[in-house]
Amino acid sequence: MERPELPIGLPDDIEEKKEAARKWFEGLRDTICASFEALEDGLEGPLSDQEPGRFVAKDWSRENGAGGGGRMSMMEGRVFEKVGVHTSTVYGEFSPEFRAQIPGAKDDPRFWASGISLIAHPVNPNVPAVHMNTRMVVTTSRWFGGGADLTPVLSRRRTQEDEDSQLFHKAMEIACRNHAVADYDAYKAWCDDYFFLKHRNEPRGIGGIFYDWLHSSDETGGWNADFAFTRDVGRAFAMVYPKIVRSNFNKLWTEADRDEQLIRRGRYVEFNLLYDRGTIFGLKTGGNVESILSSLPPVVRWP
């Protein structure tokens, strides 16, 4: 989807809105981390004799005079081989070569951005990998963006008819249908288009939703409507993904399943390093490199 021209101008209470968004993202982080630790505790199948994982949090600040920072929350456990749940709130100025690509930054390079980003790589190949992020960005304009997508690593489960796929899609659809400012059909198609490995001519997973540059007019609810929808995307994810994990994490798997999982993880690496907009944004705005690249899986192979 082509980037739209967003209206220039900010509401008088933009600072209060920034603070509300930041608090929401950080609260969602804490909710998800607690939920994922509960999944670690609840394992009864393979590897249940191992100690359950716990998140390790690390705060970071931007360097070289740039403003803001964030928190990395990483866990390696018996359910999640690697999962990162990160929040950040950063501000400063876009570099000259990056300004023209960002709405409202061409003539004024100042920006503020806050958000949450999550990628989970489970141990059990029966449990799909997942990605979720939502964010608020402010330049001389303002908008929300984000989404969530599911990546089953076994070919027999990587279908739209699979029960996990249907459950995930339904959760995202409900989150969208409850808000007039959201367009589920467009966001689902955008996700399919965005999470596509062009050099392989194949999708990364089974999809989900993806949206960006959400800036509704005051007549359709404005910032409040956009923020309400973005919160419901986070809530939908926090509800549906643990259900999917619990329905699969006690199942047995084979060495062939593990091999297929590692090969599928290679597609994750290829996408994140070649195409991912968030990775490029973070690296070009002086983000925390360790946090940005923590989305990469811990063990990968290529055939």
UniProtKB/Swiss-Prot annotation:
<feature type="binding site">
    <location>
        <begin position="286"/>
        <end position="288"/>
    </location>
    <ligand>
        <name>substrate</name>
    </ligand>
</feature>
<dbReference type="GO" id="GO:0004109">
    <property type="term" value="F:coproporphyrinogen oxidase activity"/>
</dbReference>
<keyword id="KW-0627">Porphyrin biosynthesis</keyword>
<protein>
    <recommendedName>
        <fullName>Oxygen-dependent coproporphyrinogen-III oxidase</fullName>
        <ecNumber>1.3.3.3</ecNumber>
    </recommendedName>
</protein>
<comment type="function">
    <text>Involved in the heme biosynthesis. Catalyzes the aerobic oxidative decarboxylation of propionate groups of rings A and B of coproporphyrinogen-III to yield the vinyl groups in protoporphyrinogen-IX.</text>
</comment>
<keyword id="KW-0963">Cytoplasm</keyword>
<feature type="binding site">
    <location>
        <position position="117"/>
    </location>
    <ligand>
        <name>substrate</name>
    </ligand>
</feature>
<keyword id="KW-0350">Heme biosynthesis</keyword>
<comment type="similarity">
    <text>Belongs to the aerobic coproporphyrinogen-III oxidase family.</text>
</comment>
<dbReference type="InterPro" id="IPR036406">
    <property type="entry name" value="Coprogen_oxidase_aer_sf"/>
</dbReference>
<feature type="binding site">
    <location>
        <position position="199"/>
    </location>
    <ligand>
        <name>a divalent metal cation</name>
    </ligand>
</feature>
<dbReference type="InterPro" id="IPR001260">
    <property type="entry name" value="Coprogen_oxidase_aer"/>
</dbReference>
<dbReference type="GO" id="GO:0006782">
    <property type="term" value="P:protoporphyrinogen IX biosynthetic process"/>
</dbReference>
<comment type="subunit">
    <text>Homodimer.</text>
</comment>
<feature type="binding site">
    <location>
        <position position="121"/>
    </location>
    <ligand>
        <name>a divalent metal cation</name>
    </ligand>
</feature>
<feature type="binding site">
    <location>
        <position position="169"/>
    </location>
    <ligand>
        <name>a divalent metal cation</name>
    </ligand>
</feature>
<comment type="pathway">
    <text>Porphyrin-containing compound metabolism; protoporphyrin-IX biosynthesis; protoporphyrinogen-IX from coproporphyrinogen-III (O2 route): step 1/1.</text>
</comment>
<dbReference type="InterPro" id="IPR018375">
    <property type="entry name" value="Coprogen_oxidase_CS"/>
</dbReference>
<feature type="region of interest" description="Important for dimerization">
    <location>
        <begin position="268"/>
        <end position="303"/>
    </location>
</feature>
<keyword id="KW-0560">Oxidoreductase</keyword>
<feature type="site" description="Important for dimerization">
    <location>
        <position position="199"/>
    </location>
</feature>
<feature type="active site" description="Proton donor">
    <location>
        <position position="131"/>
    </location>
</feature>
<keyword id="KW-0479">Metal-binding</keyword>
<dbReference type="Pfam" id="PF01218">
    <property type="entry name" value="Coprogen_oxidas"/>
</dbReference>
<dbReference type="GO" id="GO:0005737">
    <property type="term" value="C:cytoplasm"/>
</dbReference>
<feature type="binding site">
    <location>
        <begin position="133"/>
        <end position="135"/>
    </location>
    <ligand>
        <name>substrate</name>
    </ligand>
</feature>
<feature type="binding site">
    <location>
        <position position="131"/>
    </location>
    <ligand>
        <name>a divalent metal cation</name>
    </ligand>
</feature>
<dbReference type="GO" id="GO:0042803">
    <property type="term" value="F:protein homodimerization activity"/>
</dbReference>
<dbReference type="GO" id="GO:0046872">
    <property type="term" value="F:metal ion binding"/>
</dbReference>
